[in-house]
């Protein structure tokens, strides 16, 4: 996962998990002051700063407060047995439209939970597992060696860039990670450059519209908010598959 403006160990002191259920907290306060984007930001990227909510960093993008993040000590949470029941990742992976030789980037790959499950679907392709935490990448390398998988490639990204060559990707996947990016505008711009024309973004986020999804508000997104942010970055909304238990499965095209 990507580390934002202030790193957070995603442990029980910051997010209480009981039988796979995450304790909810209050919604964020609105932003109160505009700030200039960094020099590397596209001209259209504007952030605001305000009071940070308990789970946020006090930085806002298109009115959404960016959440605190999951750190590498939470690998156990990413690899939990309940994930198949709660999120149906097998169903999500089967819904990816990937050619056998596709190159897909798993942005905020974390422990590689998705990357290693996508790997056999693209035997002549590659999964580029992008993360900015060296500890996550070390875990990925060790797991790849244990599994004998050679087409999952750990890749060190940056907080404001996927750090991949232009037009090098057929697709990109972001699973419960985008809402944590500390520089989402710059990340989307770099991803737009890295995707080939017609390349797809598969964006999975817990449904912010559904109060029954037991995830804290800042770690969820509505479809409307996701569309606002990605369409402003030049991506075309294609569809939102609705068969997953807790998550949106949104598809965008470059």
Pin down the residues of each PLM region.
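Class I SAM-dependent transferase core
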Residues: 32-99, 103
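A short acidic, Gly/Pro-enriched loop at the edge of an enzyme's catalytic core
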Residues: 162-171
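Conserved SAM-binding loop of SAM-dependent methyltransferases across substrates and taxa
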Residues: 111-123
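A short SAM/SAH-binding and catalytic strip from SAM-dependent methyltransferases
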Residues: 170-184
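A short glycine-rich, Lys/Arg-flanked "PGG" loop and its adjoining helix->strand segment in the class I
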Residues: 185-200
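Conserved class I S-adenosyl-L-methionine
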Residues: 202-225
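Conserved SAM/SAH-binding beta-strand->alpha-helix loop
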Residues: 133-134
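Conserved SAM-binding strand-loop segment of SAM-dependent methyltransferases
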Residues: 147-160
């Amino acid at each position: 996962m990507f580390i934002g403006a202030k790193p957070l160990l995603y442990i029980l002191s910051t997010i209480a998990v009981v039988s796979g259920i995450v304790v909810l907290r209050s919604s964020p306060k609105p932003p109160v002051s505009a700030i200039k984007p960094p020099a590397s930001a596209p001209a259209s990227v504007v952030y605001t700063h305000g009071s940070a909510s308990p789970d946020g960093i006090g930085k806002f993008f298109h009115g959404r407060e960016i959440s605190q993040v999951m750190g590498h000590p939470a690998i156990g949470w990413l690899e939990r047995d309940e994930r198949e029941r709660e999120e149906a990742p097998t169903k999500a992976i089967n819904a990816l439209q990937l050619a056998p030789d596709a190159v897909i980037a798993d942005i905020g790959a974390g422990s590689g939970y998705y990357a290693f499950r996508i790997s056999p679907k693209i035997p002549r392709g590659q999964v580029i597992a992008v993360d900015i935490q060296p500890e996550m990448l070390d875990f990925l390398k060790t797991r790849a060696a244990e599994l004998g998988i050679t087409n999952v490639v750990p890749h060190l990204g940056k907080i404001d860039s996927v750090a991949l060559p232009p037009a090098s990707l057929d697709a990109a996947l972001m699973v419960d990670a985008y809402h944590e990016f500390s520089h989402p505008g710059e990340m989307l711009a770099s991803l737009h450059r890295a995707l080939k024309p017609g390349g797809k973004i598969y964006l999975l986020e817990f449904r912010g519209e559904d109060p029954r999804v037991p995830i804290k508000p800042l770690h969820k997104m509505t479809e409307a908010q996701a569309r606002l942010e990605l369409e402003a970055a030049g991506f075309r909304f294609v569809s939102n598959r609705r068969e997953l238990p807790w998550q949106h499965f949104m598809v965008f095209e470059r």
